[in-house]
Design a protein with these regions (language model features):
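A membrane-interface helix-boundary motif in multi-pass transporters
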Residues: 172-196, 390-399
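Hydrophobic core of transmembrane alpha-helices in multi-pass small-molecule transporters
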Residues: 102, 113-129, 334-348
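Intracellular juxtamembrane helix-capping segments at the cytosolic ends
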Residues: 128-142, 348-362
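Juxtamembrane intracellular "pre-TM" segments in multi-pass secondary transporters
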Residues: 3-21, 209-249
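Glycine-rich segments within core transmembrane alpha-helices of 12-TM secondary carriers
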Residues: 150-172, 374-384
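Structural signature of the two symmetry-related core transmembrane helices
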Residues: 90-105, 309-324
Length: 399
């Protein structure tokens, strides 16, 4: 079902972003601040909380695995219910609120295990909100402009997240001398700053979002909940019968595993190699700055060569990146090379996967289908991070 009062007017693919598209994009700027902090600062802080014989790569890998598993189990069920008119924004708000509150809670004086538990909850909040946010793409723009809008989301998310991140890093390194604060206190303050940024850049979406495509009205919510499991089985059957869709899902499962594992484990892996925290931070900033134009460029190239062609090109590039990381990543120089290579392709492959999927699914069942999208994506994340964590635990060597 489609709400005719909220359908977007036809906009040429080459036209500038509309107000509705910009307000959708800006949430990527907000949540990406937490993503970047999770990649650079939080693993280093968590390592400082662990006992001397603790293994941060293993612990971090298991934390990522647990968070991914919870999301993979929850999202298809909640996604089916969220297709009811008006429910998508409520579920989004619930997960977003969980992420922000637990991001603030990480500033509490916790030992390493409770800290990881709170971090897992924050990650669940983030990833849960992103599932509903991704499905909002179909409400924010048209099929013809999805590649462009999705790419701008990732691109501006990469560059926008560097603003609070640079401020937090300056506070962590300069705060002890400027304010007579400890490094630990400055790090905890960075969690609060990130949460505030996240909230500030979510407000435009919360105040303007209108669900264009939906499956049922409010008075049908009870029956929608009761029939969720049978509907999920039916949806899975439809996916299996839709050859382009299930072929994409299988391919997505395998290639996104590499993408998610490299992103989530890069800092802890670099720290285990002995790369100091300053170099890790600068390398990740370089990744963000490289990813900004490359993600937007990928959206433009998709308009010229086609989305599938550009996804294939990014997959081939990522295969080379993973091969490089597995066999050549032994020092700071190789880590810098990895940072630049990842920045060139990660935004494009994520953005175009999101938009391509949005174009081939039924719009009035978008949340349900994006729930299955998350099953494949998060299960892939579970496999990658679990393998890294287990291998490190068994061998005692991250490399």
């Amino acid at each position: 079902m489609t709400d005719p009062t909220n359908v977007h007017e036809p906009v040429p693919q080459s036209a500038r972003l509309t107000a509705r598209e910009k307000k959708w994009i800006i949430y990527d700027v907000g949540n990406s601040a937490f993503v970047l902090l999770s990649t650079a600062v939080i693993p280093i802080y968590a390592k400082s909380l662990m006992p001397a014989d603790g293994n941060i790569v293993s612990a971090w890998g298991y934390a990522q695995t647990i968070a991914s598993l919870v999301i993979a189990l929850l999202m298809p069920l909640l996604g089916s219910i969220a297709d009811v008119q008006g429910m998508k924004i409520k579920f989004f708000l619930g997960f977003f609120g969980t992420g922000v509150v637990t991001c603030c809670a990480m500033a509490l004086p916790l030992t390493w295990l409770p800290f990881l538990v709170v971090y897992i909850l924050a990650t669940i909040g983030l990833n849960g909100s992103l599932t509903f946010y991704d499905s909002m793409l179909i409400d924010a723009t048209s099929n013809e402009r999805m590649d462009k809008v999705s790419s701008h989301g990732y691109g501006w998310g990469y560059i926008g997240s560097t603003v609070p991140f640079i401020f937090c890093i300056a506070l962590i390194f300069g705060g002890p001398s400027l304010f007579d604060w400890s490094t630990v206190a400055c790090t905890r303050a960075s969690f609060i700053i990130t949460a505030i940024w996240w909230v500030a850049f979510t407000i435009p979406l919360l105040t303007s979002y209108r669900q264009v495509h939906y499956r049922a009205t409010r008075d049908q919510l009870g029956s929608a909940v009761r029939g969720t499991f049978s509907e999920l089985a039916g949806t899975f059957g439809k996916i299996v019968k839709n050859k382009p869709l299930w072929m994409f899902m299988i391919a997505f499962f395998f290639y996104i595993d590499a993408v998610n594992t490299v992103i989530s484990m890069s800092t802890s892996y670099g720290a285990e190699l002995g790369i100091d925290s300053t170099q890790l931070v600068v390398a990740l900033l370089v990744t963000q700055f490289v990813a900004f134009p490359c993600a937007i460029l990928y959206g433009r190239l998709a308009g010229r060569f086609g989305c599938k062609v550009m996804i294939t090109a990014a997959v081939v590039a990522y295969m080379c990146i993973v091969f490089f990381a597995a066999f050549f990543l032994k020092s700071a120089v190789e880590f810098w090379i990895l940072a630049i290579l990842v920045g060139m392709f990660q935004g494009g492959i994520q953005a175009l996967s999101r938009s391509y999927y949005g174009k081939i699914i039924p719009k009035d069942h978008a949340n349900e289908y994006y729930g299955f999208y998350d099953i494949f994506g998060k299960t892939a994340s579970i496999i990658g991070t679990f393998l890294v964590a287990t291998t490190t635990s068994l061998t005692g060597n991250a490399s």
